[in-house]
Amino acid sequence: MVDDVISKGTSPECGKSLTYVGPSPCDLSHGYQEPIGMTVYKRRFIGVAHLALLNIVVSWGWVTYPAVPVTSAVFLNVSVNAITWLSTGTLFAYCISAPFVFQTVERLGLRGSNMITSVLLLVGNWIRYAGTASEVKNYGVVMFGQIIIGLAQPFCLSTPSKFSESWFTDKGRTSATAIATLANPLGAALGQFANPYLAKTPDDMPRMILIISSISTLAIMPSFFIPSKPPTPPSTAAAVDRTGLLVALKDVARKRNFWLLSLPFSIYVALFNSTITLLNQAVIPYGATEEEAGIAGGILIGAGLVGAAILSPLNDKFKWYMGTIRSFLPITCAMYIALIFAPASTLGIWPTYVVCAILGFSSFSTLPVLLELLAEITFPHSPEIGSTISWFGGQIFGAVFIIAQSAMVAGPSANPPYHMRWSLTFAAILSAVFLPAPLLLTLVDPGALRRREQWHNTSLETARDSA
């Protein structure tokens, strides 16, 4: 049902309040488009909730085994490093399917993208369950299931910006993008919190996988019923005709300000992926239990969700994009440095909890802002182009970082054995190296921001002048 109508400008023919897309109705020159009434629908909330649900279960699938690395290793009769590879394999699988998101959304729409996510999730989860059954315990089958889940992830993680532009006005886009996007790390938080309690012993592993697979099966059902876009667009930005894929990619590749955002975005996403994957191994050598390590991971994500919930509505209203980035990215960098020392603190696990809370709050506060800025910079191209490229970089760098940081684990003769001090130092250095780039965005190109709003205002002025 329609819950709100946004009226901008006046038709000179009938006097009806409408928002014009392109020139005035009096302009019969090339490129004339009929005016379109801009409308938003209540069903958009169902759509964003379902997209969030898909991101929750796909991320929960990613961290299923790394959340309980020792228990998983004992059950599958493999090393802890092999369990880490279940996470790494998922990230590499993401990179295989990510390039297909562009054509999928263009040809099948958001509904088609969600359906592909759902089918792959269904198949991947139940293959994992088959590999984890007590009679089988086959690491290869489990890895195959993880890879299929990884193939599903880009079809729901790269599309929130597209969904928010298709269904929401500029007063709600940042919040909608945040809800759907940050549901992905929420799924990882659920895994960090719940899995140590669902699988307290190796014999509990089949039951844990059965529960996760059942929840995922229920979560995918609405994919087949939610449409790709509303009957009428919510804003002029959503109504713009998009350029072809190859033209868009060539144009985006030439935008310096795009790379100033996209590359740091990819690096910071990769650092989060490696941190959430290796956090257990970073704190356990200092005496923490798997449950305490899981709580640390949950705090990392939970505090981030709180930060995003506070700042996303404020950014929708006040557009504090650059202020948010300049305030919170340096804090994020400082917390990666603090994480080097927190696990070894004589105060136990509590300093790690504090660092994880601040790191999560600052990281997640900037994530939806960065995605919205990417959509602004790449406009009038489709929003999923910038987000897919950036998420692709985050996943592939994340996989590389996990491999590199796993190789930096200290040996059995270290104090304490198998500590990850050098791995955490590696992450801190990377966060510092890529910090300056996004802070320089408006200095390099002052017109990079709010281009959709500028185009929107220009359209209204054209309509009024013609009237």
Predicted regions and their residues:
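Cytosolic juxtamembrane N-terminal segment immediately preceding the first transmembrane helix
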Residues: 2-60, 65, 74
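Juxtamembrane intracellular "pre-TM" segments in multi-pass secondary transporters
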Residues: 30-41, 232-261, 458-467
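Extracytoplasmic gate region of multi-pass secondary transporters
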Residues: 65-66, 255-311, 401-402
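Helix-to-loop junctions at the C-terminal end of transmembrane segments
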Residues: 96-112, 306-320
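Cytoplasmic helix-loop-helix junction between adjacent transmembrane helices
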Residues: 143-183
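Glycine-rich segments within core transmembrane alpha-helices of 12-TM secondary carriers
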Residues: 172-200, 216, 391-402
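Symmetry-related core transmembrane helices of the 12-TM Major Facilitator Superfamily/SLC fold
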Residues: 206-225, 421-440
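C-terminal transmembrane helical hairpin of 12-TM major facilitator-type secondary transporters
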Residues: 319-370
